[in-house]
Amino acid sequence: MIPRTGILLVALLLLACQQPPTRETLNSQLPERPYSGVVRAGHTYYFAGRVSVSDSTRALTEGRTAAEVRNIMESYRTLFDDLGLEFSDVVQGNVFLADVNDYAEMNAVYAEYFATDPPARTTVAVAALPGGANVEIAFIAVRAAR
């Protein structure tokens, strides 16, 4: 019984002595905003929410939400490529919709990027989003060993 207790105590001591993950701000091109675009802590990446409103999407009456979701996801693809990540590294998604009636339209495009083994996700309907956007999406990703 004592050897097991000793091993457990040594394991707990080693865990307590580990260095916490280093926090690093990445892709911080938002000097006018009080938040970071991406924060990395160890192998975990926390992405601020992204919206995609442009004159072309604002002019859409049908398919606007789908166009915004596709633009957001493609901007994530570019960012992930820069950081050496893939959509398969995403473990949590948070989606904010200005109109809950756009859920099916958003979901159809979102599913294209997570065809197999999708991450956990929360979807929330909100009163409004910055810039008149219909959709905002934020992710948490963990870099997988490759």
Language model feature labels by segment:
Residues 5-74, 78-91, 97-146:
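N-terminal presequence-like segments and the immediate start of the first folded domain
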Residues 1-2:
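N-terminal secretory signal peptides that target proteins for export/translocation
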